[in-house]
């Protein structure tokens, strides 16, 4: 299985590069699943709803995020409807959107889990405890589990 993960796509130059390169990279490397962190796609902070379709049309399968996901208020209603745009799973209960998804990629089912670290970040639930809770659930549905850990410290 060939996996492509990239982040953070930053602003218009990052969006343009991804739109230009991802289709070719998918063909050239026979990529089965492409996960793209988009939390800084709107001018370096946040993401706007129309960008979701741009990324998916360019070949991204799942969009992940981090602490800037809700910087643009317009994303709140979009993230509640779009299950391929993830926010960190360790955000408090009741936060719009989901922190994980499963999907078919070639012959496999793939789970993608989005977590956020706590060092040098705003207070949030423990990502490791949240992973311990969610990974077994994903493992019941998916043979492959990818984790996007958005963090400031490599120790996390």
What is each stretch, according to the model?
Residues 1-156:
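Acidic, metal/ion-coordinating pockets
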